[in-house]
């Protein structure tokens, strides 16, 4: 037990330093190309912080543990929205740009609709469905690239106020992004692998590990990025990262794992005799995303009450999971 605990601590240190470098690089990239931080967060940062989910879910699906891949995607969305976004919103509520949020939010709910059809109507995730998810990922990236082309003109006036002398070189920006992403991925893997060993030693069921511990572990890059962004005053970067990561969890993470190894909806965890994901996790996933995004789209701001409500939902879900 000592070795897993030590590796767990090493992973945590990797995450902290990697998050610091990654946020610095992402913020510098946004300033260099005069792009909104929320947009950079929803694309570049989200890709980097979603790498652990991609790796964990792909390895799980290929090794025959579709339950882990399925639970990890849903659990990561819940964790991102009801824990990480909740912390960000509760600590620093504020204004957001609804226009920048529209594309990722629309793609998330479109992907969630496909996910619901597979889970409720089909009862399985087939390879053709995986191709559809990957196609949605490509469409999402194209939509964001088109949005980025419009962003510089809108941000030109603001960009003129930046101090050019303090601008980070492009080479250093890319080095910080890459090294930060690598440290985050390594740290997350160390935490997930060794944390899972510790949880298994304590007798925690695999389905519960997937929806809570593994989901939290693979969401640690988002958590580290969110906290680091808050400390550095880049809250838009944090929110964009969370929403973008949720889209990637449903279209990229699930798309890759389903394409490589199709699987049926797991039935090991039940609630009232019904698959718990159908009556609990998926409805909660949709609910927390609506609570997080709809007020922002309508009013252009996030309130502390939203963060508190989301944290309460996450705490209640964890309590239910560990008592099933």
Summary of predicted features, one role per range:
Residues 1-324:
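Hydrophobic alpha-helical segments, chiefly the membrane-spanning helices
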């Amino acid at each position: 037990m000592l070795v897993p605990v030590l590796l767990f601590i090493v992973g945590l240190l990797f995450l902290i330093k990697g998050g610091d470098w990654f946020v610095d690089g992402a913020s510098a990239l946004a300033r260099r190309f005069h792009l909104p931080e929320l947009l950079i967060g929803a694309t570049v940062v989200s890709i980097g912080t979603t790498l652990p989910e991609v790796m964990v879910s792909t390895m799980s699906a290929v090794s025959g543990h579709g339950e882990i891949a399925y639970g990890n995607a849903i659990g990561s969305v819940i964790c991102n929205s009801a824990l990480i976004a909740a912390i960000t919103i509760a600590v620093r509520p504020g204004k957001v740009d609804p226009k920048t949020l529209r594309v990722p939010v629309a793609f998330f709910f479109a992907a969630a609709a496909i996910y619901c059809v597979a889970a409720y109507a089909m009862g399985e995730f087939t390879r053709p469905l995986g191709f559809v998810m990957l196609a949605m990922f490509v469409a999402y990236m194209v939509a964001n690239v088109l949005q980025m082309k419009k962003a510089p003109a809108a941000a030109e006036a603001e960009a003129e106020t930046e101090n050019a002398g303090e601008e980070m070189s492009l080479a250093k920006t890319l080095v910080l992004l890459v090294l930060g992403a690598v440290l985050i991925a390594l740290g997350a893997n160390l935490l997930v692998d060794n944390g899972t060993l510790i949880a298994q030693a304590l007798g925690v069921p695999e389905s519960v590990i997937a929806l809570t511990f593994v989901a939290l572990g693979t969401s640690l890059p988002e958590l580290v990025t969110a906290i680091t962004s808050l400390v550095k005053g880049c809250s838009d970067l944090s929110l964009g990262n969370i929403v973008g990561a949720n889209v990637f969890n449903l279209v990229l993470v699930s798309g890759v794992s389903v394409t490589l190894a199709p699987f049926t909806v797991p039935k090991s965890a039940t609630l009232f005799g019904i698959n718990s994901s159908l009556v609990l996790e998926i409805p909660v996933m949709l609910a927390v995303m609506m609570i997080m995004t709809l007020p922002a789209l309508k009013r252009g701001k996030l309130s502390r009450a939203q963060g508190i409500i989301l944290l309460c939902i996450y705490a209640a879900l964890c309590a239910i999971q560990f008592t099933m």
